[in-house]
């Protein structure tokens, strides 16, 4: 899906900011070769996805998102976002290399 931008508001931005991440880091991680997987455990009235990406400095990030159409424009709505812990990064890198070697 090609997206037209991001859906930021007072509902989702504070959830991301409380973990010390910036909007620009989140947007970069989502636009530069992220790994995206469905998140059925957190999907209710709308589908949610888990996204693993990297900020401009290469730090791994975990981001929960949903996709919405607002005024006819498809947007990415980040919900929670945080930096990944070292153990999570190691697991992600192992899985990613196994996927790429298939």
What is the predicted role of each segment?
Residues 1-102:
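Ribonuclease/tRNase effector modules and their secretory precursors
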């Amino acid at each position: 899906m090609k997206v037209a931008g991001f859906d930021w508001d007072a509902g989702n931005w504070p959830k991301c900011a409380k973990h010390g991440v910036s909007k620009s880091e989140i947007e970069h991680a989502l636009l530069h070769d992220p790994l995206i997987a469905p998140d059925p455990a957190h999907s209710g009235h709308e589908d949610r996805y888990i996204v693993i990406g990297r900020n401009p400095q290469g730090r791994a990030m975990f981001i929960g998102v949903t996709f919405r159409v607002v005024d006819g424009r498809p947007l990415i709505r980040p919900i929670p976002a945080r930096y990944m812990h070292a153990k999570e990064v190691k697991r992600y890198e192992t899985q990613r290399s196994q996927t790429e070697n298939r």
